[in-house]
């Protein structure tokens, strides 16, 4: 039986951070003869990696721009409702088999010495849900690991 992988990301394009990580992940899976289904709000059809995926649009064009990140997880769930594949989340998504964590909102606020406003509180709530429902979390640094455990109460054994 061939392994089926879904990847959730905001934008499938060349860029920094999670965009680069997503493209590297797609290329690595392709070398293993796995064609992932990629769920994203936007796709760059002109990049070579586009030919290596099965694209699925997470439609958010009717959602207010400031709220898109908060509603991505529910739109993703609707879009992939018939998928039995393992989910790798490179963007905010609940119930991921593997959640990629490059930063936490509480950590950002702490390091910037800022108090949370309404949008920050929504982002923190979204983070808590994403971390609580993920089976595994890959923290990109020791600092991320400390923030996940210390600020969000994520069990250390859940973090890779």
Which sequence ranges carry the predicted segments?
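An amphipathic, basic-hydrophobic alpha-helix
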Residues: 61-87, 120-129
